[in-house]
């Protein structure tokens, strides 16, 4: 009788062992949490802010207050899913003279009571071997 239960017990034990694996185990192609201070996340965030400013019709630049949450996904490169807080600066945009990220981050802010903040969700797709980074999705409110 024990002989017939062994083939059933082995797969059951394997299933239980798999369920006990840490939830942070990376699933190929799945989303993985990333530290907001990770250098690759910071690089993607800087790119997102620069692209936001290039695409927005605002007369002033917005700069990064903080990265709230970051995830990444391996997809023919790496796609970063970022939730960020941006704030409107006193730096006005000048036609033909766009500022780079570091310049934008040095822009002064209005007094706290007058600050305009945005929460933005960005998707940044990085393919370093092609020297290519794209902002594939952006929504702010």
Swiss-Prot record:
InterPro entries: Cystatin_dom, Cystatin_sf, Prot_inh_cystat_CS. Its main location: secreted. The record marks 29 as: Reactive site. Residues 1-26 form the signal peptide. It is found in: Secreted. Inhibits various C1 cysteine proteases including cathepsin L, papain and cathepsin B. This protein has no toxic activity and its function in the venom is unknown. It may play a role as a housekeeping or regulatory protein. This is Cystatin.
């Amino acid at each position: 009788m024990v002989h017939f239960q062994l083939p059933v017990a082995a797969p059951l034990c394997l299933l239980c062992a798999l369920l006990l694996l840490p939830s942070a185990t990376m699933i190929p192609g799945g989303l993985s949490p990333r530290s907001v201070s990770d250098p690759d996340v910071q690089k993607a965030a800087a790119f997102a802010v620069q692209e936001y400013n290039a695409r927005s019709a605002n007369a002033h630049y917005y700069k990064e207050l903080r990265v709230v949450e970051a995830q990444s996904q391996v997809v023919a490169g790496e796609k970063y899913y970022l939730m960020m807080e941006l704030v409107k600066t006193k730096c006005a945009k000048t036609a033909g003279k766009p500022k780079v990220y570091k310049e934008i981050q040095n822009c002064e802010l209005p007094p706290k009571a007058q600050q305009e903040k945005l929460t933005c969700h960005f998707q940044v797709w990085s393919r370093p071997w092609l020297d290519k980074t794209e902002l594939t999705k952006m929504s702010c409110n």
